[in-house]
Amino acid sequence: MRSSVLRSLRGRLVINLESTRKLRLSRTNIVPGRKKGQKSIKSKNMARKGNPILVRLGKNRSSDSSWFSAEALLGCLYFFIYFVAPTLGPVLFLLRLIHFVWGLRLGLGNENFHFGVGPDGGATGLDLNQPPQEQQPTLGVNRAALDLNELPPVHLLYAEVEGPQSTKAQNDVMLAHLNQVQNLTRDLQTEPNIWRRQALIDILDWEVRSLQRHFRIFRQRDRLREVQRSWLREQLNRYR
């Protein structure tokens, strides 16, 4: 009786040991009867074909296509045409408007100047686009070889005092520009809006350049008038 119980317990123990051994072998993926470093056929197929689950999910591609495929490029082109391109119109228009305003600011005469008076009484500064200069009359050595008809007649010379090119008319034009500059300067000091201040600065810049140009031209005309009058006095004194 005792021997039969021992044999039954021994059989159960052998079965338990065998099941435990198989469980350990299944966990370590080692098939009985194979060497320790040798891989199974299943693992070889998985390494060659890839994990079936990952292959179905598309995450185990050995030669994955580039992101810049035809479909991706077409998608980017579609997004650019229908979403990005419509927003570029106002941006380009704004850039062209800024370029136009900036060119208008720097293109009115293309001048770099400083307002002042030189030693000869003329306005100083650098002007790239100068107005046409009136040339002085060409006089001989004795100033007597020239014909009197080459200069304006006496009545026209002295009638010019009350004409549109007279000193009074020139002073009125200069005074109008000077008053405009003073008014713009006063408005600029009290203007809080930055955009209107910039517009006032542009207008003031143009007014100062116009004032300088008129000042230079009028000074040249005054010098020419003085040369004509001095030559006429010499001619009149010669026949007294």
Curated annotation (Swiss-Prot):
Name of this chain's protein: Uncharacterized ribosomal S3-like protein AtMg00690, mitochondrial
Cellular component GO terms held in the UniProt record: mitochondrial membrane
Claim: Transmembrane is one of the keywords in the record: yes
Record lineage: Eukaryota, Viridiplantae, Streptophyta, Embryophyta, Tracheophyta
Membrane topology: Single-pass membrane protein
Keyword annotations: Membrane, Mitochondrion, Transmembrane, Transmembrane helix
Family: Belongs to the universal ribosomal protein uS3 family.
InterPro entries: Mt_uS3-like
Cellular compartment(s): Mitochondrion membrane
